[in-house]
Amino acid sequence: MILGQPLAQWRAQYPLLDELIALRETSWFNPAVAPAAEALGDVGLSAADVADARARLERFAPYLARAFPQTAASGGIIESDILPLPQMQALLREEAEGEIGALWLKRDSHLPISGSIKARGGIYEVLKHAEDLALAAGLLGLDDDYACLDSDAMRAFFGGYQVAVGSTGNLGLSIGIISARLGFQATVHMSADARQWKKDKLRAHGVTVVEYASDYSVAVEQGRRQAEADPRCHFVDDENSRHLFLGYAVAGERLRQQLAAANVVVDAEHPLFVYLPCGVGGGPGGVAFGLKLAFGDAVHCLFAEPTHSPCMLLGVHTGRHEELAVQDFGIDNRTAADGLAVGRPSGFVGRAMQRLIDGYYTVSDEQLFRYLALVEQTEGQRLEPSALAGMPGVLRVLGERQGYRQRMGLTPQRMARATHLVWATGGSMVPEAEMDSYLARGRQLL
């Protein structure tokens, strides 16, 4: 029984479950998607909240530029570039047997400090917590030069506090590195699928890593328990945190500026499609919220998940969100896309974004590795498996038979003028030997 219903009843009510349970690559275009002006109200956060987060990151820029010299060139702003992918675009055009528009890569894989999209939300939340503590203690003023936080005295102050998080890898890396640098005692609770090199890197930064034999949800639960037992411990809640979400959302306006600088037009006649790898949902949900604020109905966001971990698709499609885990349906949550190995989605994100996300699709590990090798071969970009989940998105949109494009007014003419942006979530910090093994596996599939 699953939530009081036998499996057969679930399958009869939601025929799509047959595809998910069989681990087949699946696409579902959301019939409930609504105009941004209407659906943004579901989120419970506003453009003013995102502007507040953006201003906070600007206040911290002098600190980051000093504490992390790799951010000095960008003045302490943690941002990634966008890159056209002409060779991959040509390959996908062949596969689509028609015009697809322009293909771009968003290189969060190369974000400074922790080399993944989690450098956005994770670092932001810890900075916000540090600011709150320092302001309350009278050690910092909003108009001060925040570079003053990079001092022994401030590290000693933060050393009286703890930060904890549960993670499959990249969020833990971001939280651990920034927390330790500020002076916090940091603990990362890591699930069984976390890569060894991520654990090693955290320990090298003086972070306590607690390992679990079970999956992501257990690691998060243990982190939450640690924080509940200690009033001086801040738990970064990947499933429910509004601060994480806002840290990611800042990306929307920045991308608008980047595309404008690259002379890429985004409007109803030139739609923008953004393909976001999805684990628990905080990163893609926050980014999509920021994108909807920046571009309104001209942007179409899709979430991509591994066939073995389709937690958000399952939760939104059934409307039961975090009440369901993929394991309830015999789906094992085992994937090489470690950052996406999540069995139970964020209910906050699922509900907040369910009328703003155009579609959800799943990708097999084989396809992730195939695209990993192809992108390296054609464009010279080295990405981790999770980061490739967005690559087949354009083919899913052009190949759908659910009436989605017709419903959204996405005519062949508009599709030919579209921009497709694949959000590459991580990869630059993967050790060379591990990357070589990824590439070898992918090349066997070409």
UniProtKB/Swiss-Prot annotation:
Keyword Lyase recorded: yes
Keywords: Lyase, Pyridoxal phosphate
InterPro entries, per the entry: D_Ser_am_lyase, Ser/Thr_Dehydratase, Ser/Thr_deHydtase_PyrdxlP-BS, TrpB-like_PALP, TrpB-like_PALP_sf
Residues annotated as signal peptide: none
Residues bearing the modification N6-(pyridoxal phosphate)lysine: 118
Catalyzed reactions: D-serine = pyruvate + NH4(+)
MF terms (GO), sorted A to Z: D-serine ammonia-lyase activity; hydro-lyase activity; pyridoxal phosphate binding
EC primary class: lyase
Biological processes per GO annotation: D-serine catabolic process; isoleucine biosynthetic process
EC code: 4.3.1.18
Signal as UniProt keyword: no
Obligatory cofactor(s): pyridoxal 5'-phosphate
Protein family membership: Belongs to the serine/threonine dehydratase family. DsdA subfamily.
Database matches in NCBIfam families: D_Ser_am_lyase, PRK02991.1
HAMAP family xrefs: D_Ser_dehydrat (MF_01030)
PANTHER family: D-SERINE DEHYDRATASE (PTHR48078:SF9), THREONINE DEHYDRATASE, MITOCHONDRIAL-RELATED (PTHR48078)
Protein name in UniProt: Probable D-serine dehydratase
Originating organism: Ectopseudomonas mendocina (strain ymp) (Pseudomonas mendocina)
